[in-house]
């Protein structure tokens, strides 16, 4: 058990990514840090998978957009929100241009936040925090009044926020401090 959570995650010991074990389950919020640029993920059985039906089949060479569509397929259609990290290459990969266009045309992308390099222990690349939102209309939401954000996307580039260098075992790493995080959150909420 992890912090009191049962290890039983379903009737089958299988990957819910390549064999969706949670069809019909929808969530208010999803947070994820999927493997960046995963290769070898594709299986011929996925060709007709419902998760791609509105967007097209993600490229076999890289699972980034398969993860995006997997996450989107499990958000509550009325008001689900997701936040997840992907390698920056997902923003301009030519093989995923049509899927990216449809995500924007369908008004699913709320924010793209490019983070500084060297935040992760395992890689030095800069990554992007994506925020998807099923409902960008204004109104009351959890005690807050939100303005209508339909057909708008917030872009934040935090790559220059590199002041807080921390020496690791073998490499220098960057850590965002509480004031930087609060500033980014304030920009997002004010927008």
Indicate residue ranges for each PLM-predicted region:
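S-adenosyl-L-methionine
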Residues: 1-25
């Amino acid at each position: 058990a992890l912090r009191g959570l049962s290890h039983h995650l379903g009737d089958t010991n299988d990957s819910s990514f390549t064999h969706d074990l949670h069809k019909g389950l929808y969530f208010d919020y999803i947070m994820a840090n999927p493997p960046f640029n995963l290769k070898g993920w594709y299986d011929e059985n996925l060709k007709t998978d419902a998760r791609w039906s509105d967007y097209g089949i993600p490229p076999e060479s890289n699972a980034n957009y398969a993860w995006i569509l997997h996450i989107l397929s499990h958000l509550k259609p009325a008001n689900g929100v997701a936040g997840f990290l992907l390698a920056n290459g997902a923003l301009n990969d030519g093989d995923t241009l049509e899927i990216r266009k449809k995500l924007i045309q369908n008004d699913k992308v709320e924010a793209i936040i490019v983070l500084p390099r060297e935040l992760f222990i395992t890689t030095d690349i800069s990554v992007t925090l994506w925020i998807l939102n099923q409902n960008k209309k204004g109104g009351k939401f959890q005690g807050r009044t939100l303005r209508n954000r339909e057909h708008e996307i917030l872009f934040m580039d935090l790559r220059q926020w590199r002041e807080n260098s921390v020496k690791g075992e073998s490499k220098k790493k960057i850590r965002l401090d509480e004031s930087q995080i609060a500033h980014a959150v304030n920009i997002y909420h004010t927008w």
